[in-house]
């Protein structure tokens, strides 16, 4: 979280200090605005009766969404660095190392949750719902598409619409 929307406001000594150049801050805002809008478009609960649909709050969850994306990218790099000496392991149960990496990430965030709790968490929790931590995050990561040979489909996000914060 040291380089998310909150952590970036602190310098190397932990003091709140605007240490970024104006250009860096502007570029960060452009990228994070895209991520906020991606999450804002996620319907977490459909309209029901006279109740409108409930949408994810990309601004509320921005720091965590940045951390999820950054953590995935760093851990993926670490995984591949571990292959340098011994090579990439053989597929297991038909899944490559990259596929198992992303399947493991998705498995972590599985939830069984009631609609009332989804509505509450969407309004107060800085973390995106588990489903969105997986689907919305992975949509921006090229190596995910490569791992599964994804070229189009409902969850496909065209390359020009993807955003990588770090």
Q: Where are each of the predicted segments found?
A:
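Zinc-dependent metallohydrolase catalytic domains
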Residues: 1-166
């Amino acid at each position: 979280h040291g380089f998310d929307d909150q952590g970036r406001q602190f310098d190397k000594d932990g003091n709140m200090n605007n240490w970024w150049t104006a250009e860096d801050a502007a570029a960060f805002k452009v990228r994070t605005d895209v991520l906020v809008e991606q999450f804002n478009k996620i319907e977490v609960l459909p309209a029901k009766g006279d109740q409108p649909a409930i949408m994810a709050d990309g601004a509320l969850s921005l720091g965590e969404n940045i951390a999820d994306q950054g953590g995935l990218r760093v851990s993926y790099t670490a995984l591949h660095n571990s292959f340098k000496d011994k090579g990439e392991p053989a597929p297991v149960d038909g899944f490559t190392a990259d596929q198992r990496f992303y399947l493991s990430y998705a498995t972590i965030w599985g939830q069984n949750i009631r609609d009332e709790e989804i509505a509450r968490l969407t309004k107060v929790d800085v973390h995106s719902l588990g489903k969105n931590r997986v689907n919305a995050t992975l949509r921006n990561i090229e190596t995910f598409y490569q791992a599964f040979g994804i070229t189009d489909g409902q969850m496909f996000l065209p390359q020009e619409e993807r955003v990588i914060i770090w």
